[in-house]
């Protein structure tokens, strides 16, 4: 919509008329940038996400989606020949692909629930994605004779994030990808009541593929109840796809450890870390760990950069 600023005064209406840029992805050849923009309608009280592609120098900006569906989180795949993205056209949020000009759209996943974020493995053979898992019994579950009851009995924390009642937890899933669809879906936190990524703001940036596509690093605060509510002590875990084993590499750190990223050669892992438990606004430091030192009896403690 048009942005109207009258009398050189920024108004709420003008702010709502501005598009909000979301996810950004650079093509493998570094020549193009795909990104999402959210537009808001005050009369309809809702937003709509569209995708754009432009040249890396800022020229030739073009909109590649124009519809009522929600398209978001563009990612270049298949050597830059396709753009993968999330779309709810099928009735739930799934991974789709299309050409960089917006043609030849195709649905890639048909997962039973909404997919909230995703990342293809470096070798393109697997898909890491985020989906909600039920962790709390609803009133109807506890009292099947009262199927329409909406009351909630709270006996413990954490029962709410801002405007959202806690009934589910986001879990990371790994699946095989053959270029057209997924199979052999595995919940990395199967049977665990924890969140990864962490609510309320965490997304796919809290998980990372190893360059060899054989491991996934993820952020998790493995606590529940009151301990979860008062603590910021999250950790970086590494999940081995071949063995199914998980290793905590930041157990000594007491504050937030988030957003892991592997070095291109897979020898190091970097992440953001806060020093103290319980302080959400503590200083974020950048840590780098030499992964070859993890299994030594007295590993070298990583120092902030």
Model-derived regions, located:
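Residue-level detector of Asp-centered blade-edge/turn motifs that repeat once per structural unit
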Residues: 28-29, 78-79, 122-123, 211-212, ...
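Hydrophobic beta-strand positions that form the internal "hydrophobic ladder"
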Residues: 33, 80-84, 127-128, 216, ...
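Short loop/turn segments that connect beta-strands within beta-propeller blades
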Residues: 55-59, 99-103, 177-180, 240-244, ...
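Surface loop/turn motifs at the tips and blade-to-blade linkers of beta-strand repeat domains
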Residues: 15-18, 65-68, 109-112, 189-190, ...
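Short glycine/acidic-enriched loop and turn motifs that connect beta-strands
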Residues: 39-43, 89-92, 134-137, 223-226, ...
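Single conserved hydrophobic/aromatic residue that forms the stacking wall/gate
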Residues: 294-305
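Predominantly five- to eight-bladed beta-propeller fold
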Residues: 49, 132-191, 219-222, 226-235, ...
């Amino acid at each position: 919509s048009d942005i109207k600023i009258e009398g050189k005064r920024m108004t709420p209406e003008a702010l709502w008329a501005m598009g909000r840029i979301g996810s950004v992805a650079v093509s493998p050849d570094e020549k193009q940038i795909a990104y999402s923009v959210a537009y808001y309608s005050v009369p309809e009280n809702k937003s709509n996400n569209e995708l754009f592609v432009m040249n890396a120098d800022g020229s030739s900006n073009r909109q590649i989606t124009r519809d009522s569906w929600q398209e978001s989180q563009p990612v270049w795949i298949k050597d830059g020949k396709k753009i993968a993205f999330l779309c709810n056209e099928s009735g739930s949020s799934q991974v789709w692909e299309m050409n960089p000009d917006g043609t030849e759209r195709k649905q890639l996943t048909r997962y039973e629930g909404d997919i909230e974020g995703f990342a293809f493995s470096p070798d393109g053979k697997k898909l890491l994605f985020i989906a909600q898992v039920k962790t709390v019994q609803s009133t109807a579950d506890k009292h099947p004779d009262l199927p329409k009851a909406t009351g909630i009995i709270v006996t413990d924390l954490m029962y709410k994030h801002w405007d959202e009642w806690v009934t589910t937890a986001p879990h990371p899933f790994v699946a095989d990808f053959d270029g057209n669809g997924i199979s052999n879906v595995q919940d990395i936190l199967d049977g665990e009541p924890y969140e990864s990524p962490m609510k309320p703001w965490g997304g796919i940036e809290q998980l990372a593929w190893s360059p060899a596509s054989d491991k996934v690093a993820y952020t998790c605060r493995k606590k529940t109840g009151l301990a979860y509510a008062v603590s910021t002590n999250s950790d970086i875990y590494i999940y081995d796809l071949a063995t199914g084993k998980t290793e905590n590499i930041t157990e000594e750190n007491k504050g937030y450890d988030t957003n892991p990223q592997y070095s291109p050669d897979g020898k190091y892992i970097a992440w953001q870390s806060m020093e103290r438990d319980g302080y959400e606004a503590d200083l974020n430091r950048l840590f780098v760990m030499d992964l070859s030192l993890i299994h030594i009896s007295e590993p070298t403690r990583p120092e902030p950069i």
